[in-house]
């Protein structure tokens, strides 16, 4: 089944999207924790090697919490990792793992996949999921992020959900 054939599937409603959001939230927390551990490891390695001054702090965690610049860099790193989780899944297959479980796919109305830039814009416009509330008052089942990025979330058939949506896979 080509991507253009995905253009004929119905749009997803609020509760199906909410189910996928809950699944994906668990995965995003895992990505957050892994990114945090990697970032903490990098700061620990930099301070142990002497490339990063401890500025009188005894522990790296104190350094991260007590220095606004380092705390900002650390939080930016974690936020970028979680954001990339969504951007990569949305642009290279149209589905996160939570969306796959609920048979949802993000695409343009013609069935084409989102670019990484469109996926990033969609992430920003989703307002941490609050943009989905627009579906409750919009008869077209379009969320705020759908309208702003000219995309849609569709419900795939069981057969279409079994196919490999990833580019080159």
Q: Where are the regions that the model predicts?
A:
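Short, small/hydrophobic-residue-rich motifs at membrane-helix boundaries and re-entrant hairpins
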Residues: 1-127, 156-169
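Hydrophobic side chains within alpha-helical segments
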Residues: 20, 27, 125, 135, ...
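Membrane-spanning helices that line or support transport/gating and their immediate boundary helices
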Residues: 37, 41, 45, 136, ...
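Hydrophobic alpha-helical transmembrane segments and immediately flanking/interface helices
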Residues: 104, 137-164
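Glycine-rich flap/beta-hairpin and adjacent strands of clan AA aspartyl proteases
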Residues: 129-139
């Amino acid at each position: 089944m080509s991507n253009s054939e995905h253009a004929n599937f119905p749009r997803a409603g609020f509760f199906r999207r909410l189910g996928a959001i809950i699944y994906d939230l668990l995965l995003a927390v895992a990505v957050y924790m892994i990114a945090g551990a990697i970032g903490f490891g990098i700061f620990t390695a930099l301070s142990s090697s002497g490339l990063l001054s401890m500025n009188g702090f005894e522990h790296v965690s104190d350094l991260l919490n007590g220095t606004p610049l380092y705390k900002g860099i650390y939080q930016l790193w974690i936020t970028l990792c979680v954001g990339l989780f969504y951007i990569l899944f949305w642009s290279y297959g149209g589905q996160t793992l939570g969306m796959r479980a609920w048979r949802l796919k993000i695409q343009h109305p013609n069935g084409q996949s989102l670019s990484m830039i469109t996926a990033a814009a969609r992430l920003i416009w989703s307002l941490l999921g609050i943009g989905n509330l627009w579906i409750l008052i919009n008869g077209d089942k379009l969320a705020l992020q759908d309208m702003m990025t000219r995309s849609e979330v569709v419900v795939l058939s069981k057969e279409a959900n079994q196919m490999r949506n990833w580019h080159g896979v």
